[in-house]
Structures are given as C-alpha cells and as structure tokens.
Amino acid sequence: MTEGIQNVSQPQIKIENLNLWYGEKQALKNVSMQIPKNSITALIGPSGCGKSTFIRCLNRMNDLINNCRIEGKVSIEGKDIYEPDVDAVELRKNVGMVFQKPNPFPMSIYDNVAYGPRIHGANKKDLDGVVEQALRSAAIWDEVSDRLKSPALSLSGGQQQRLCIARTLAVKPKTILFDEPTSALDPISTLRIEDLTMELKKDYTIVIVTHNMQQAARISDYTGFFLMGELIEFDQTRQIFQNPREKSTEDYITGRFG
C-alpha cells in the first residue's frame, strides 16, 4: 500500500494489520487504515476483493461465520473491539449496518423502527418520539407519517431502504456501515440515498462499500481501493480520483479492469 494518510487527528476507527481467513483461504491481508470521525469513507474495488469482508470486521459480523479467523486490531474510539470483554450485541448497536438489498422486517413501518429500541430497553412512552426522529433523520417521515401501521413491505424499494436506515438510526449508533446500499435501487432513489448519506455525516461516521465510481467520487471524503484482499491505496477521495499513487488504482477507476 502507498503512504496516503498515515495519521488522522480524530480517528473514529483505527485498523492495524488486519488479516482474515475463511478456513485456509486468506481474504484480508495486513490491512491498516484510520477512518476519520464524521466523514464518509468509500471502499472500492472489484468483486471479491475483500471490501464487504472488511466492513463486517468493523462490527464483528464475521463472528457469525463458521471457520472464520481474524488477526490484527480494530479499535473504535480507542477500544479494541476484539477484546474478550466487548459485547458484540452492544457493539452492533453502536456500529449500525445497512445492507445491499432493503430488508425490512415483516411488520409495520412503526414496528420496524421501534424494534431495536425495544430490544435495548427503551421506555415505551418515549418510542413515538424515537420513531419519528429516526424517520425524519432518514428523510422518509413526510412520506409515511400518516400510515405508520401499514406493512413496511408495502413501501417502494427506495422507501424500504430509507426505512432500514431509519431502523439503524433509531438505536443511536455512532458509526454506520453501508454495504452497496443503492445497488438494487433506481437512479432517483439512489440520489436520495446519496443526499441522505451526506447529510448524516454531520452526526455519524460513515463507511460505504460501492461498485459505483461516480458515487464514491460524489459523496465520500476518503476512499480506499482494495484488490485481492489488500488495501492498495487509501487517501482523500480527490487525491484517489485525480492523482492516484498506484497504477492499479488508476487502472481500476478508469475502467481498465474490474
């Protein structure tokens, strides 16, 4: 990996020499990165390069995969999340995740958003306010405020994805991971999610996996390029797209492979 950004004054997440294996297959190789607070970091690279595997290390989703082994260090706000005393459920409350395809629960719009706060012991009398605030923050309140008891699955794809973002926001995370959140959406819905993401970075640290080079260039502050399990280059997005240090980075973003 080229030098790029070495020391961030306020890193929300610090990754040091991260390696991951699925059985005998090594999927991540000596990945180190510092993700700044209240920023959008985009992860780009061809399919199978390790991007999604990497972000699942940031909230220990890989714990759920059999035969997965991890070495290295991932610190969030100075705390190593792989220490034995770390509660993975509490970690995932603080590091929320939005997936590639909208995955609302088969329940009402209201109950989708209230689900997480209920699990974490929210006071019943506070739920209405929590739900409204999350839906407003996800820019969907005006579209659903008069039908909160309707099935979430009755919403359009773009609305469902914003509902899933609201569901994530409802438990008040500090970091949000997006794994290709617009790949299943139409261009108009994609633009709304992008606008929302840029608005959310005021209050959250955001890491987004995307195959869309234009999307990464439009919305992110920092970009990391992965190839075959290695972080090839990590820098400010402007630097990556205008003057990459590595030829393989330039080849990828100009469409020579991928």
Curated annotation (Swiss-Prot):
PROSITE patterns: ABC_TRANSPORTER_1 (PS00211), ABC_TRANSPORTER_2 (PS50893), PSTB (PS51238). GO terms for biological process: phosphate ion transmembrane transport. Residues 13-253 form the ABC transporter domain. It catalyses: phosphate(out) + ATP + H2O = ADP + 2 phosphate(in) + H(+). InterPro entries: AAA+_ATPase, ABC_transporter-like_ATP-bd, ABC_transporter-like_CS, P-loop_NTPase, PstB-like. PANTHER family: ABC TRANSPORTER I FAMILY MEMBER 17. The gene is pstB. SUPFAM superfamilies: P-loop containing nucleoside triphosphate hydrolases (SSF52540). One of its GO terms (molecular function) is ATP hydrolysis activity. NCBIfam families: 3a0107s01c2. ATP binds at G45, P46, S47, G48, C49, G50, K51, S52. It is an enzyme of class 7 (translocase). The lineage of its organism: Archaea, Methanobacteriati, Methanobacteriota, Stenosarchaea group, Methanomicrobia. It is found in: Cell membrane. Its EC number is 7.3.2.1. Part of the ABC transporter complex PstSACB involved in phosphate import. Responsible for energy coupling to the transport system. Belongs to the ABC transporter superfamily. Phosphate importer (TC 3.A.1.7) family. One of its GO terms (cellular component) is plasma membrane. The complex is composed of two ATP-binding proteins (PstB), two transmembrane proteins (PstC and PstA) and a solute-binding protein (PstS). Keywords: ATP-binding, Cell membrane, Membrane, Nucleotide-binding, Phosphate transport, Translocase, Transport. The keyword ATP-binding applies. This is Phosphate import ATP-binding protein PstB. It comes from Methanosarcina barkeri (strain Fusaro / DSM 804). Pfam families: ABC_tran. It is a peripheral membrane protein.
